[in-house]
Structures are given as structure tokens and as C-alpha cells.
From Swiss-Prot:
Protein name, as recorded: 3-isopropylmalate dehydratase small subunit
GO cellular component: 3-isopropylmalate dehydratase complex
HAMAP family assigned: LeuD_type1
The EC number(s) this enzyme carries: 4.2.1.33
Keyword 4Fe-4S: no
Length: 206
């Protein structure tokens, strides 16, 4: 997972409330478990409209999505985070997020920034009116700035912040303790009453 420290990017505005996960990635595309290949189906139904934001050349290559409140509601599908990341978004800014989506996004390297409704509306308006409108999001400083006078700070769980800064998903975090895991297995491998038949090492590779 790519570490997230400071991101400077143009902004894609999505001025819609209650954007649910079925709109983010419709159910007919949830037929595999790989994390890649979903970007082309992001907001699939809405992208049938030529006027939809993601179809506009001015927003091409944007890595920051600014959306209205209650983003990511609906089902718990992790594919929603996969689709956003595969499309190229590394940060989503909104005034509120659904809890499960919030967890899924962070575990997949996407920084979710919660700002006030007033500040989100300001960013939406500026992104809609200003060609090439950009933001700088610093996870290290926990700030959002646009170089035009807008500046705000945001809160984030300390553990999630650490994982994003280090580029660690759940597996990567676990693998940092590989030496301790190996030592535990070695220590307990001879205690047959605690291990499956063949020992801990055998059970892990079976």
C-alpha cells in the first residue's frame, strides 16, 4: 500500500448527498475478489450521463474527491473502496461518512477527511467554478489548504493515521511482527496439546 503523507491534486466535486455504495460500484460488478479492475465501473450508472463530473476532461487525473454528506452509505461492500482507489482517488473529503465505508477506505489506503458542511460547500463551489482548482492535503500536519485562503484542520484516529503514513494494510501490519510470530510457533511447536496434528508450522502451510 502506498504511504500517504502529502497530496497535491486537482479536485473533483460531487455535490450529491447520501452517495451509497451501490452507486459507487454497482452490484453486477462484484464477481471477483481481486482489488484491481474496478475503476472503469466507478459510478457506472451516473457515468452514462455525458455531463457527469467524471466524464469531464477538466477533472481527469484528479486524486481528491469532494462529496456531500453521508458518503458511502448502503451496503458494506469493500469493493467501493477498491473502485475509488483503482480509479485514482487517494482522498475523499466530506462532512460525514458511513461507518463501515470509513473503515474499508482507510484499510485500502484512501484518506477520508471530515470537514464541516460549510467548508465542504465552499470546496464544492470553488471546484465547480474554478478550472484546475487544487488542494493540498497533509496527513502529517492534518490540514487541507487551497493556496487561495482556505485552510482547515481535520481529526483522524491515531492508529489509522500511522498505517496510512507507513503504507500498511492489515496484512502489512501483521507481517511487521513476522519474527515474533515465528518465535511463538517455535516455542509452542513442541507442545502437542496446544497445536493441531503436525504442529503449528504444518498447520500454517497446509
Amino acid at each position: 500500500m502506498q504511504p500517504f503523507r502529502t497530496l497535491h491534486s486537482t479536485v473533483t466535486p460531487l455535490d450529491r448527498v447520501n452517495v451509497d455504495t451501490d452507486q459507487i460500484i454497482p452490484k453486477q460488478f462484484l464477481k471477483r475478489i481481486e482489488r484491481t479492475g474496478y475503476g472503469e465501473f466507478l459510478f457506472f450508472d451516473w457515468r452514462q450521463d455525458p455531463a457527469f463530473e467524471l466524464n469531464q476532461p477538466r477533472y481527469k487525473g484528479s486524486q481528491i474527491l469532494v462529496a456531500n454528506k453521508n458518503f458511502g452509505c448502503g451496503s458494506s461492500r469493500e469493493h467501493a473502496a477498491w473502485a475509488l482507489g483503482d480509479f485514482g482517488f487517494r482522498c475523499v473529503i466530506s462532512s460525514s461518512f458511513a461507518d463501515i465505508f470509513h473503515s474499508n477506505a482507510g484499510k485500502n489506503g484512501i484518506l477520508l477527511v471530515k470537514l464541516s458542511e460549510g467548508d465542504v460547500n465552499t470546496l464544492l463551489e470553488r471546484a465547480q467554478k474554478t478550472q484546475g482548482y487544487s488542494l493540498t492535503v497533509s496527513l502529517e500536519e492534518q490540514t487541507v489548504k487551497d493556496g487561495q485562503g482556505f485552510s482547515d484542520s481535520f481529526e483522524i484516529d491515531a492508529f489509522r493515521r500511522y498505517c496510512l503514513l507507513e503504507g500498511l494494510d492489515d496484512i502489512g501490519l501483521t507481517m511487521r511482527y513476522q519474527d515474533k510470530l515465528d518465535a511463538f510457533e517455535k516455542e509452542h511447536d513442541g507442545k502437542f496439546w496446544l497445536a493441531p496434528r503436525g504442529g503449528l508450522a504444518a498447520s500454517r502451510t497446509s
